[in-house]
Amino acid sequence: MGSEPKPYAQPLDSAAAASTTKGSCGPRKPENPDFFSTVEDEQEDGFLRHLSESTEDFSLDMGALQGSEYLRDLGLGAPSDLHQSEVIMDPETHRQEARRESSHTSCEGASALPQRRSWERSRSCSGSCRRLSLDASTVDKGACLPRTLASLALNLSGNGQKIWTQGCLPVSGTPAPSSKECSSPEKRLRSKSVPVSCEISCMELASDSDVCTSPVQGLEPPVLECLEKDHVEPEHVLIVQQVLQELRQYHGARQRARMSTSPGGAHSNLTWFEFLSESEDGACKIEKPGKSTRVKRSLSSLRSRVTRQKEKGKSPAHLKDKTQDLPGKRECVNGHQLMRGTFSGHSSCPLCGEPLLNSASLKEHPRTTLLSDGSSPAPSRNVGMTISQKGGLQPTPSPAGSGVRLGPIAGDMDEADSVFLKLKQTADDSLSLTSSNAESVFIEDPYIASLRCEIESDAHEFEAESWSLSVDLAYAKKQKKEVVKRQDVLYELMQTEAHHVRTLKIMLKVYSRALQEELQFSGQAVSRLFPCADDLLDMHSHFLARLKERRQEFLEEGSDRNYVIQKIGDVLVQQFSGETGERMKEKYAVFCSGHNDAVGQYKLLLQQSKKFQNLIKKIGNFSIVRRLGVQECILLVTQRITKYPVLVERIIQNTEAGTEDYKDLSQALSLIKDIISQVDAKVSEYEKDQRLKEIAAKTDQKSSGKLKNGLTFRKEDMLQQRQLHLEGALCWKSTSGRLKDVLAVLLTDVLLLLQEKDQKYVFASVDSKPPVISLQKLIVREVANEEKAMFLISASMQGPEMYEMYTSSKEDRNIWMAHIRRAVESCPDEEEDVFSEAEEKKIAEARTMKLQEFQERLSLKDQLIAQSLLEKQQIYLEMAQLSGLEESAQNRGLFRGGGDPSETLRGEQILRSAMSEIEGIQSLICQRHLGSTSSQVEEGSVSAGLPRRAETFGGYDSVGSPSKGGSFKRKVSNSDLRPQDWQGPASSPDSRPCDNSAPSGCCEESPQAVEMPSTESLPTVLELELVHRVQTLSQLLLSLQAVIAQQDSYVEMQRTAIQEREKQFRLQSTRGNLLLEQERQRNFEKQREERAGVEKLQSQLRQEQQRWERERARQQQELELAGARLQEREGEARQMRQRLDQERTELERQRQAYQHDLERLREAQRAVDRERERLELLRRFKKQNTVPGALPPEVLAEAQPASHPPSFNGDGLEGHSAPAKAPGTQGSAMLHGTGPDNVERPEVARWDSAPPESRPAKSDVPIQLLSATNQIQRQTAVQQQIPTKLAASTKGGKEKGSKSRGSQRWESSASFDLKQQLLLSKFIGKDESASRNRRSLSPVLPAAHGSAPASDPCFPAPSPAPAATPPEAFKFGGTSLPPVSPASSLPTTPLATTDEVSKEDVIFF
């Protein structure tokens, strides 16, 4: 099928299939409006729902359907009978209407309702060709209503509709006569999915760029004819709706169809989706139209799933191979010729997988064919994350210049236009895309695939979160806790290093490669975004490989997972030291310095270049990128170097101290920190340079600053070998007191004061002071009483200047002062050399030329001196020739006064040679002296020497005159020498003692002189040698003189240069130098004062420390004394505890003894009770036999011993204050109350249990009226009474002599008891007042019920034997206990009151 845009048709969705021309201008109405309106409403609702969920934008290129089977099969057969009102439209009419409606759309589209929809699921035309191909073999097998109705819905060509309808409908499905169908309410004249010709509008949509794509050349728009009375069955309408829905899905329709359905059916070669729809054909025929929406949705869902699977399985290579297999020619299937469309390369149909050919596709230009005016293609909408390739959009050709489309009629124009205006605005916000398949091609690139495999393989090795999870669980549990922590940190180091390498690979191999290949970025532009990325990747890849190797070295045998890295420090030291460390330092400095520039450049490109933006979005969809954008990558690489110290410190914390690895790790940590510090310094320096460039760029070109010496400082001078130290806002105070805001820029040698004016920096001017301050001789001082102010004093030679500057805070002031002072110290000493380079250069050149002139003059004089010396030597030689001596061959070579200065200035060597010659001369003279002595002995006569000149060569005079042509040697050797010739040299005044060494070249002897064997020839040889020696010595001395002259010249030159420098220094020693020296002296004094203050503080600190030590010693002594006292007290407490233990032991012993005595007392008490009972029985017996009144008191007194002993019953104590009781039961009760069982806690006698005769009389005080006074008064009346009857009866019995042995025993016991009672009464009398007080404190305790306080169990009542023991004997711990009387256990007052009735019966004491 072709790619030409077809005349616009509304979207062929379910709503379009069910819609009619109800809203059009035509007069035609459906015969069954209720039935089809229901279908329309249901389909419209489904369409609106689908539109709200749609997020993509695809459109149907109707021009691409021209020449296809969809349109060609509509022209088969003869035209059917048409209604008399049908309208035939030719292609020219379509084109004219399209042009008119295009302008109408652009004017009224803003107010239209959103009826045109967009679907982002486009389908290629090649796939559509396969799907729409007709198979002749299947034509006769049955009707295929969806296929034929779809074709009819697109185009109806004249009378061919009738023939097509009659031939395509099955026999069983032949419709009834039209008159019959028209009258039936269940029939309808035509479907709402097929448009009437008069209702067809040729509206054209305005594109984003107001350009339209031309249809394919050679294809004419089809002639659309509408039918009035033909109609189909309702179930056929449903199938038509399904096919139209498929057509919209396959071609991404952007329009809504408002057409009427038409009858007919034909066989077609169905695709998978058509087969699914036809499989439910039987069910669709009996279903109601309301179910069409559900069928449509199920088919759409199935289509989406299949499409996604087909899109996933396609690769670019596979698609490329298929493009070669598909012929680009027409196919003739079932009598229909289908035209292949042309598509862009490597594009494929997402449904069938077939590649699209050539240059254009529906998906590539989803809106080009719809939103254009025919001149140029419109930019397509951004489909998802699809990124366009390079290049512009290729226009799609159109035969007529504008696409003719099916669209709404005039009544729906506004609504349709508004939708497309909205789509246009949406497209303006998105980027234009050139190829929808560019992304898939790039993703499936083999290079990207291999890179993804490489990155995934690296990530797979470190996919576990920690070392504990990467090794076997049992192996991890066997390790110590410290080992596990260390291995976890090492694993984290390797894992983060692998992530860092992955980030660098993405930067270099994804982004950088894409920029170079896709956008043709230069290497410099890429390096600006990713500086030094390749070097960093190389270094870190090597580091990661070393870490993996170290991990491999420590793998357990037989395992590929379990490992414990024992040593890692050497790898870290190797990575961060040496050449690798320097390289890392350099590269990270460059990368970190360019961080801000890279981010700024990226943002700028992202804003200005749509191609760059598209490429970044495209790369962002890659799976290997994983949300790592350019900024994220740059930031991660910048921060990576700062992560190493943290990891290494954690490794050190879990490493045993003192080991070799611990030392290596510590060294690696120091190296890493050093690298980071240097990188920070480089980054800071780079940032300062960038800031200086920004300031210079912002500075006004015309602005300049005048210096004190008159020179000018301009904008260009800022960047001339100057660095920025500090910049910030200051306030410059004028003489009037006003503050002016300035920007202070501290450079290497100057301080600039700028101010902002019209967004430009200009040199500030306050009080006509120069805004450029030289740092040479600059003095910085604080302002008194001003924390934020400082003085800048420029001690220049041209005149000092003082600036008063203010900062925002004291801290800023101190920072500025410190930076300025450091800059002054590091500033060159030459004053203002940077400002007067030209003048200084001229002065230096003049000085140099002058010194060179002096040097030339001195050299000339040295040459003259050397020449004079040479001439002088020549004279000497001539004189020697006159004397007949031969000239030496090396005479002229010995003196080099006129040679190279490097050879002449060898004074030391010349002097040594001269000394050697002198020594040789001395030895020769000695030898000659010996020879002349021997000759004098032989001849016997001494001849005097010839006269000589002092300054000649040895003063030698020869008798023979030398010939002119002979030499000095020859003449000497051939002449007749006389003995007196040897005397001259011996007495020569020029001979002096010297060294023994002589150079070999200075004393050459002739062969004749050396080989003379006779003694006569010896003086001649010595004479010749002596002459040579003297001549050589003369030459050496002359050379030394020349050297000395030259050295004098050099010395003078140096002295002159020194004097020149001193002069310059003296010229610079002006007032500025004095001020600077004063400032230095002041600073020195200030430092000395500060040092003195520090020393004073140190002395105070030492004194405080000494005082503190003394105080501490004193406190220590006090603590020692307190400790000693505490120990003493502890000893005393220990002794007291021992004494207490002893006393407690003694008391325990006494208590045990007391208990023993108490038991004895109780036994005795029980015995007394038994005796008392017996005596009571005896008394009763006596009472019965004795008359009470006949007995006199004496008898009673004698019978007293028979009564109870008072010491046992306690009645003696009561006898003084209470009357005697009656004998009988009362006495037994009293004895029972004082029995041994009640000794410790005596019981109080009950009032109602007492016998009537023992109760008190009425005359006594009642119980409720008892008081302390009554008790005291009753107790004071203590008297002893003896009943007369008892006394009489006792006396009578005595007189009768009826005493027995028992009565005698009772008498003796009674007398003993009486004595004991008397003693006890004495003791009781002493404590009577105390006992009264105790009884008076309890007024509510009556005499009848109250009893004395219970005696302590530890102190029983006294036994009869120790009755006389005083109370003081019972003491515990020095505390006396109150004595307990026997009467304290008995009731007092009630018993005494009741006994008054029977005084005769009982005797009381």
Swiss-Prot record:
Matching entries from Pfam families are given as: PH_16 (PF17838), RhoGEF (PF00621)
Listed Gene3D superfamilies: Dbl homology (DH) domain, Pleckstrin-homology domain (PH domain)/Phosphotyrosine-binding domain (PTB)
Please list where the region (Disordered) is annotated: 1-47, 92-115, 289-330, 936-1016, 1198-1242, 1274-1309, 1328-1405
What's an example of a GO molecular-function annotation for this chain? guanyl-nucleotide exchange factor activity
Q: Where is the composition biased (Pro residues)?
A: 1355-1365
Give the UniProt keywords, A-Z. Cell membrane, Coiled coil, Cytoplasm, Cytoskeleton, Guanine-nucleotide releasing factor, Membrane, Metal-binding, Phosphoprotein, Zinc, Zinc-finger
Quote the biased-composition stretches of kind Basic and acidic residues, using this chain's numbering. Answer: 92-103, 308-330, 1396-1405
Q: Which residues form a coiled coil?
A: 1084-1181
Q: Where in the cell is it found?
A: Cytoplasm; Cytoplasm, Cytoskeleton; Cell membrane; Apical cell membrane
Q: Origin, by domain of life?
A: Eukaryota
Where the record annotates domain PH, the positions are 723-825
SUPFAM superfamilies from the UniProt entry: DBL homology domain (DH-domain) (SSF48065), PH domain-like (SSF50729)
**Residue ranges, compositional bias (Low complexity):** 1375-1394
Q: Does the keyword Zinc apply?
A: yes
List modified residues, type Phosphothreonine: T952
What range(s) does the DH domain occupy? Answer: 485-682
What positions are modified (Phosphoserine)? S961, S1336, S1338
> Which terms under GO biological process does the entry name?
actin cytoskeleton organization; regulation of cell shape; small GTPase-mediated signal transduction
C2H2-type Zn finger ranges: 347-372
A single GO CC term for this protein reads:
apical part of cell
Matching entries from SMART domains are given as:
PH, RhoGEF
Q: Which PANTHER family match?
A: RHO_RAC GUANINE NUCLEOTIDE EXCHANGE FACTOR 18 (PTHR47440:SF1), RIKEN CDNA A430078G23 GENE (PTHR47440)
Q: What does this protein do?
A: Acts as a guanine nucleotide exchange factor (GEF) for RhoA GTPases. May play a role in actin cytoskeleton reorganization in different tissues since its activation induces formation of actin stress fibers. Also acts as a GEF for RAC1, inducing production of reactive oxygen species (ROS). Does not act as a GEF for CDC42. The G protein beta-gamma (Gbetagamma) subunits of heterotrimeric G proteins act as activators, explaining the integrated effects of LPA and other G-protein coupled receptor agonists on actin stress fiber formation, cell shape change and ROS production.
This protein is called: Rho guanine nucleotide exchange factor 18
- Gene source species: Mus musculus (Mouse)
Q: Cite the source lineage.
A: Eukaryota, Metazoa, Chordata, Craniata, Vertebrata
* Protein's gene: Arhgef18
